[in-house]
Amino acid sequence: MSTIPADLKYASSHEWIRKESDGSYTVGITEHAQELLGDMVFVELPEVGDTVTAGEDCAVAESVKAASDIYAPISGEVIAVNESLEDSPELVNSDAFGDGWFFRVMPSDESEVDALLDADGYQEVIDEE
């Protein structure tokens, strides 16, 4: 059973966000998601400057088992991507909530954050799977 950090917000599609000091949000996939996918072999990220829309696919995580679309938890402009994943996609497996982050978004509508789940709500999603 993986631990779900209480300081993050979650999408039911297994992405997490963390607010940063500059007002942007870091996006990644949860420990649970990486466990389901297995060993990562490739991560396709959006481009810096791209606009992402909440609920729409914007990245792909490929593992030895499957390729899975990654959905934007909130809308906004991509301001950074985790270039380390290009050479080391396994960071998603070893540190899903840390060094395995995918990209950062400057939100266009911060109220979308309110629609995301807290740790308890996300645990309920996992329990219902």
From Swiss-Prot:
Transmembrane portions of the chain: none
Cofactor note (record): Binds 1 lipoyl cofactor covalently.
All residue ranges annotated as the Lipoyl-binding domain in the record: 24-106
CC cofactor: (R)-lipoate
The keyword GTP-binding appears for this protein: no
Single GO cellular component term: cytosol
Single biological process term from Gene Ontology: glycine decarboxylation via glycine cleavage system
Disulfide bonds: none
Keyword presence, Transport: no
UniProt keyword terms in alphabetical order: Lipoyl
CDD domains per the UniProt record, alphabetical: GCS_H (cd06848)
InterPro entries assigned to the protein according to its UniProt record, in alphabetical order: 2-oxoA_DH_lipoyl-BS, Biotin_lipoyl, GCV_H, GCV_H/Fam206, GCV_H_sub, Single_hybrid_motif
Binding partners and assembly: The glycine cleavage system is composed of four proteins: P, T, L and H.
Family that this chain belongs to: Belongs to the GcvH family.
NCBIfam families: gcvH, PRK01202.1
Function: The glycine cleavage system catalyzes the degradation of glycine. The H protein shuttles the methylamine group of glycine from the P protein to the T protein.
Protein name: Glycine cleavage system H protein
Organism (species): Shewanella frigidimarina (strain NCIMB 400)
